[in-house]
Each structure stands twice: as C-alpha cells, then as structure tokens.
Amino acid sequence: MGVRAQQKERTRRSLIEAAFSQLSAERSFASLSLREVSREAGIAPTSFYRHFRDVDELGLTMVDESGLMLRQLMRQARQRIAKGGSVIRTSVSTFMEFIGNNPNAFRLLLRERSGTSAAFRAAVAREIQHFIAELADYLELENHMPRSFTEAQAEAMVTIVFSAGAEVLDVDIEQRRQLEERLVLQLRMISKGAYYWYRREQEKLAASRVE
C-alpha cells in the first residue's frame, strides 16, 4: 500500500472512530452530523466525501465493524474453550468484555436493530444472523445435533444475550455481576432443554420404527 493509500485509510479510520466516540446513552447515530464527525476527526467537512458517500454509509460501515468485532471475540472465546473451561461462562465473560470495552458499538447495534432506517435494520439483522449461524455451526459440531435444532438453540441464546447486554450498559459492577450469573443460568437452561428435547425426539423416532 502506497503512502497516499495509507493516509487515506488512516483518515477513514479516524472518521469511524470519531463517530463512535460521539455516541452515548443519550446520543444516537441519527443525531450525528457530517460536520461534527469531520471536526472530531480533524478534517474539513468537504473531505468527508473522499471516504464515504454520506453519513449513512459511514453508519453502515460502523454496524459491519461492530458485528465483525463481536464475532471475532467470540471466535477467540471458543479457542479458549478448546483449551479447557466452561463453554457458557467463558462465552458470557467474553460478551461482557466486548460491551465493557466497546459500549458504543453495542449501543449502535441495539438502537439500529429497531431504528427508522430500513437499511440499518437490515444491516444489523444480517450481523446478528451471522452471529447465530456461527454459534449454530459450533453447537452442531460439539453437540452432534441436527442443524434445525442447533439453529433454534443458537437463535434463542443470542436473543437472550442481546437482551442482557442492553441491561448491562446501564448498571454498576455488582449489578453487572448479578446479570452475568443470571445469563449463565438462562443459557444453561436453554442448552439442557435443547439436549433433552432432541433426545426425546430421537426416542420417539426410534419407538415409531419399532412399531
């Protein structure tokens, strides 16, 4: 990559980070302006268009980055699990670590999931579906269950995890610890329920063949 290309990439990165830094519990992406983001990144507003067509394209890039960041962290968690440790507890700790280190990235996913922009809703839905698919792949490999079961289990787990994440954004350390423990319990219940449901279906199938 040449010097100019490197500089362009650094400026693009600065715009993304500037936009993330301006998000908060009180401020959503929709309230950001091109001028504010450009000023925070240290460039002229007119230079913004060398990197993004408009603010919406910047936002969609941020959604993609947030989803990818979360998936990469969860992949690392699965690598740690392979070396020993509780699957669910390690996954929950990793997820909470993501929220703690990247609260605005998670806020963006939460808000735009049900926001007014169809493009943003579709982008967040796509990221969540990627997350569900990767978890379903892992469950299918580890638990030796059919895809239909692991997808249903993964979707239930991701729904609960995102709901808990929304609560974690606004609590203190002790409340966060309690939420983590509750989430671990809920995910274990889903996991055991999926296993016993699958086993029951297998027993029913075996019985029907005997008859």
Swiss-Prot record:
Residues 10-70 form the HTH tetR-type domain. InterPro entries: DesT_TetR_C (IPR054129), Homeodomain-like_sf (IPR009057), HTH_TetR (IPR001647), HTH_transcr_repressor_FabR (IPR050692), Tscrpt_reg_HTH_FabR (IPR023764). GO terms for cellular component: cytoplasm. It is found in: Cytoplasm. SUPFAM superfamilies: Homeodomain-like. Its main location: cytoplasm. Homodimer. Represses the transcription of fabB, involved in unsaturated fatty acid (UFA) biosynthesis. By controlling UFA production, FabR directly influences the physical properties of the membrane bilayer. This is HTH-type transcriptional repressor FabR. It comes from Yersinia pestis. The lineage of its organism: Bacteria, Pseudomonadati, Pseudomonadota, Gammaproteobacteria, Enterobacterales.
